[in-house]
Amino acid sequence: NTPLLASRRCGFPPADYANLITVGFGMLSIGIAESAMDAYATAARKSKGGAPSQAENQWVQMETGMLWTQLQAARLFAERVAWLADERSEEAMPAAAESKMLANEVAKQAAAEALRVGGGGSFLLSSPIQRIFRDAQAGALMAYSVPLTQQVVGEAVLAAD
């Protein structure tokens, strides 16, 4: 019972095919993390009042290196999930949950660091960082939430032989 024309209906996916929405959740958070990294780098490169930019500080460089590496790992994991789904592997759905969990945490961390480097101005409505920070928090709450996923993954790991 749908207004969609019969010629446009594609029916239900096969039972062995992964839930494609779940497969894409990790990529959503990766996009947020990439936006956070862009805002982070922009804020770090800004020079205020003739002072050197924060990009010259060792702690900022070290944090940038770790965030970048974590983002690359999360992206590779999400790409693997898409490949598993295309292969109709039974590992696709568990890997999708793990990928979402990792990507959400990377997005939240990158957004938090963007706030830290951006300073108080990051909380203003005119700053893209405040929106990115909210988006990162929301990603961790949408189904399946990070706490639930942590529990499910942890339970599976501890139950393994």
Feature map (PLM): residue ranges:
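Flexible, glycine/charged-enriched surface loops at secondary-structure junctions
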Residues: 48-54, 89-93, 126
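Extended, amphipathic, non-transmembrane alpha-helical segments
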Residues: 42, 74-77, 108-109
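Glycine-rich phosphate/cofactor-binding loops in nucleotide/flavin-utilizing enzymes
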Residues: 120-161
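Structured catalytic cores of enzymes that bind and process phosphorylated ligands/cofactors
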Residues: 24, 38, 101-111, 124
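C-terminal helix-coil-helix/basic helical segment that borders enzyme active sites and/or dimer interfaces
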Residues: 72-102, 115-123
